[in-house]
């Protein structure tokens, strides 16, 4: 659904907007609960904003990295896809150390500190060269993609891998 809009407005605008949403949402998490009449609404609005940004970042980074002129694309893409795991571990580690040093009542400051990551990436994506994603200027259309049987096999594999990832995540945290 969003692919046609991203192609129309460009990957740079899309990824910078996604980073802005993530930074604003995380910063809002520290500020909005005190500004709004209901702290819960402040938290919900913030979570929705940074979730939209984070989801877009996840979807947009793969094609941007894929378009980069690297010699070893497979290794680079594998590294990119491992960042979710490294990010989870890093966030847990940094949060734990932060809470041990500053206490749980300082959680708002942690949200502001975490917002620095997308804030720095706003500059990074605004200034870095982004290669065109398709050679001839026209990609595969959605209808054309739906007609390929391999597409549906990949969809099923992604559903199964997502289900197994969630199962492992739930099992490991239990």
Question: Model features per residue range: what roles?
Answer:
Residues 1-11:
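Helix-to-loop junctions at the C-terminal end of transmembrane segments
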Residues 12-15, 43:
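Primarily marks hydrophobic transmembrane alpha-helices of the MFS/SLC 12-helix fold
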Residues 20-37:
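C-terminal ends and interior cores of transmembrane alpha-helices
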Residues 40-51, 157-158, 162:
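Helical-face signature of the major facilitator-like transporter fold
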Residues 44-82:
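Cytoplasmic helix-loop-helix junction between adjacent transmembrane helices
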Residues 132-154:
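Juxtamembrane intracellular "pre-TM" segments in multi-pass secondary transporters
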Residues 147-174:
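Extracytoplasmic gate region of multi-pass secondary transporters
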């Amino acid at each position: 659904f969003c692919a046609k809009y991203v192609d129309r407005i460009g990957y740079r605008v899309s990824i910078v907007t996604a980073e802005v949403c993530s930074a604003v949402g995380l910063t809002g998490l520290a500020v909005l609960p005190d500004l709004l009449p209901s702290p819960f609404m402040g938290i919900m609005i913030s979570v929705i904003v940074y979730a939209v940004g984070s989801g877009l970042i996840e979807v947009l980074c793969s094609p941007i990295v894929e378009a980069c002129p690297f010699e070893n694309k497979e290794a680079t893409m594998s590294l990119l896809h491992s960042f979710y795991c490294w990010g989870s571990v890093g966030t847990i580690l940094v949060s734990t150390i932060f809470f041990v040093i500053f206490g749980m009542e300082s959680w708002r400051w942690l949200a502001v500190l975490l917002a620095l990551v997308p804030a720095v990436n706003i500059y990074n994506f605004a200034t870095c060269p982004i290669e065109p994603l398709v050679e001839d200027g026209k990609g595969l259309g959605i209808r054309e993609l739906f007609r390929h049987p391999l597409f549906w096999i990949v969809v099923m594999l992604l559903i199964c891998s997502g289900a197994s990832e969630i199962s492992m995540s739930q099992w490991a945290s239990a």
